[in-house]
Amino acid sequence: MLTFGTAGLRGPVAPGPDGMNVTTVTRATAGLADWLIARGHAGAPVVVGRDARNGSEEFAAATREVLAARGFDVIALPDPAPTPVTAFATRVHGAAAGVMITASHNPPRDNGYKVYLGDPPCPGAQLVGPADREIEAAIAATEPAEIPRRPVAPDRRARAARADYLARICARFEDAVARPLRIALTPLHGVGGDLAVEALARCGFSDVHVVGEQFAPDPDFPTVAFPNPEEPGATDLLLALADDVDADLAVALDPDADRCAVGIRDGDRWRMLTGDETGALLGTWVLDAVAESAVPHGDRPVVASSIVSGTLLHAAALRRGADARRTLTGFKWLVRAGEPLVYAYEEALGHCVDPAAVRDKDGISAAVAAAFLASSWIGRGGLAAALGALHAENGVHVTAPRSLRLDDPSEIAAIMAGLRTAPPAALAGIPVTAADYAERTDGLRTDGVELTGRRPDGVALRVFARPSGTEPKLKYYGQLSAPVADGSVSTVHHELSQLLDDVLAELPAGSRGEEIRR
């Protein structure tokens, strides 16, 4: 049976309690409505949006009609739209909640039901506990036969949501300078293509070339094995286009456009930046813009990254006098890291560049920010040079993940137990110590183990190990960092990359671990 958690619902579109279907969505919405009414939100605005996946229109209709029958003021977005538009509308209209029908970058068979709440101190953010457990209990108490529905049409607010979101993006970047830039872009068969192209054009970037085979929304995602820009092969068409048109920047959105991946020309080849590289570049760009702004900001600006993300942004932020904070994984925690929050990211390609308007990851505004950043480096070596400058300033940081699929959950538990009780004494010749995050007494307590160490020459190692919360996987997140002394940035980067491969290869993998590369 599908259970309601902080991510709402997500699963295959299928009949019965184990699948996403109209009955499941109807019950979930009735439970959410009852919970909102019990908290004093009867008759309040609630935003409902959807992507273009199989079942999304039917599920959105069920959601808005159940809410309308319960007396809520439903803001029903009229067309398939990116998830950030729903998050934005929830916040800007002071809604009690927002519901987005999407499964983001999951396989074509899946769909989902994501919930934002309007409660302070973080209105428009994804819900956190105990709200998920309370809503789950309300859903369990609901019988499908008792749930009425009432048709509801999009009103002026709903019809204006797209234009309002675009206007906000223009306002967010009104002080940035756009220089001529050629961009290659793909929405990976999702709903972000038209909106991204229009947002870029309105901010001064009209030279945009799109991957035609992937531009129109298609719930079957026919050109990719997985519609996730992290996956091998997903951005092959994008990078080929970027090379063909001699682009300055490549951008890939995931299907609901809440994630943004950036590709750059690095020497004689194109490559996708890692989420950590993009996060460090965008985060420092935001901080530098804040420092140059004439608007007083009072307290030190806050940037946030998750415990599995790299530490390059952390180092750069501290050098700039900012407050750099770490949170548990997930934007429900990142956007609650502290105030005044100016930027948040996690290594899985999620970026929040406008937390005043969207308290979640937002691929559209991240793409616009990347365009402004890239245009500022035209004639100076591009984003490859920008990244090199960041490494020269803060030390070279190299990150890489390793994921293992282990169908036996007991094997994952055994590996985690071994890391806690008998961790390796060294990895690739670097002595390490282990810290068990399950024993922490602060807000970072979780099922994870961190291995850290340092060589006499200043090379620092960090590996975070944790089981996946949604799949039978064990995940390692590795990082090596080192100051740039005698060697060049590229030389140090190459040496650390090779060493990190050795580190990850020495980590426990279990007897039947299937390597998952991304």
Regions found by a protein language model. Name each.
Residues 243, 247-249, 253, 269, ...:
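Phosphate-binding and adjacent anionic-ligand microenvironments
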Residues 58-67, 109-118, 196, 258-278, ...:
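Short Gly/Thr/Asp-enriched flexible loops that form oxyanion-binding sites at enzyme active sites
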Residues 2-18, 103-106, 187-199, 345-350, ...:
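Conserved phosphate/anionic-ligand binding catalytic regions in large, soluble enzymes, centered on
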Residues 116, 121-148, 278-301, 305-315, ...:
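Glycine-rich phosphate-binding loop plus the immediately following alpha-helix
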Residues 2-3, 12, 111-242:
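Gly/Ser/Thr-enriched, mixed-charge loops and adjacent short helices
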Residues 1-70, 156-181, 191, 464, ...:
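An N-terminal, well-structured beta->alpha segment
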